């Protein structure tokens, strides 16, 4: 994982699985290769194996359970996603929150398996304590802006700048900004404010031309990073 980080959460949209899931993933990977920017896709558990077999970009799970092998019906263990080909997992998304002790256990297990973790935080106050668990990145997402089309980088830029100040207290953990990211301008602003990348879902998954959206994101991310040099 290295900046600019672009993480696309497929959630459970109609085009997140099956042949539609394969189709959108291939489009995303093509743009990723065209610009030399690895894009992380966080996909439904049922798609991890299929997509990891045909793609070179990192495939993540959307969630894992902090449980050991045993009688846990319906559980998704870190070992399971590794076996399926995942390179990492999202954790603690606003739509799939878990307790702090569960986050700690999951991050540790994921790291021990040689995988990556991105832990979501719904406020900048949580960035530092979550970063102390040493995931690869923290994804800051004010829940009220998720899926709203109103970008955190425009609506609440102070959330990003404060999160940046918190992440600097812990070495080796990236900060990703998400919630409402819709345009390349939103991406540029987020990185200008100090984020290492962006997280996005509906802007890509609901688009009729997802490859154009992703290309716009990459162009502006690279432009923002170049401007900061």
From Swiss-Prot:
This is Triosephosphate isomerase. Gene3D superfamilies: Aldolase class I. The keyword Amino-acid biosynthesis does not apply. It is an enzyme of class 5 (isomerase). It is found in: Cytoplasm. GO terms for molecular function: triose-phosphate isomerase activity. Homotetramer; dimer of dimers. PROSITE patterns: TIM_2 (PS51440). One of its GO terms (cellular component) is cytosol. Substrate binds at residues 9-11, 146, 180, 201-202. It catalyses: D-glyceraldehyde 3-phosphate = dihydroxyacetone phosphate. One of its GO terms (biological process) is glyceraldehyde-3-phosphate biosynthetic process. It comes from Sulfurisphaera tokodaii (strain DSM 16993 / JCM 10545 / NBRC 100140 / 7). The gene is tpiA. The active site is at 93 (electrophile), 141 (proton acceptor). NCBIfam families: PRK04302.1, tim. It holds the Pfam family TIM. Its EC number is 5.3.1.1.
């Amino acid at each position: 994982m290295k900046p600019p980080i672009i993480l696309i959460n497929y959630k459970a949209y109609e085009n997140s699985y099956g042949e539609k899931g394969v189709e959108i993933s291939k489009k995303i990977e093509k743009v990723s290769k065209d610009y030399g920017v690895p894009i992380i896709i966080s996909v439904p558990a049922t798609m991890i194996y299929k997509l990891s077999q045909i793609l070179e970009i990192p495939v993540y799970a959307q969630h894992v359970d902090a449980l050991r092998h045993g009688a846990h019906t319906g559980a998704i263990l870190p070992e399971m996603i590794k076996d399926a080909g995942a390179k990492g997992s999202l954790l603690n998304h606003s739509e799939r929150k878990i307790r702090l002790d569960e986050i700690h256990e999951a991050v540790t297990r994921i790291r021990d398996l040689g995988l990556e973790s991105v832990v979501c935080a719904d406020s900048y106050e949580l960035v530092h304590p979550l970063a102390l668990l040493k995931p690869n990145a923290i994804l800051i997402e004010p829940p009220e802006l998720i899926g709203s089309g109103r970008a955190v980088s425009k609506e609440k830029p102070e959330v990003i700048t404060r999160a940046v100040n918190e992440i600097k207290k812990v070495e080796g953990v990236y900060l990703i900004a998400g919630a409402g990211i819709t345009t390349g301008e939103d991406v540029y602003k987020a990185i200008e404010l100090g984020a290492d990348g962006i997280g996005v879902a509906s802007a890509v998954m609901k688009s009729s031309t997802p490859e154009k959206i992703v290309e716009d994101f990459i162009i502006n991310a690279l432009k923002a990073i170049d401007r900061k040099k």
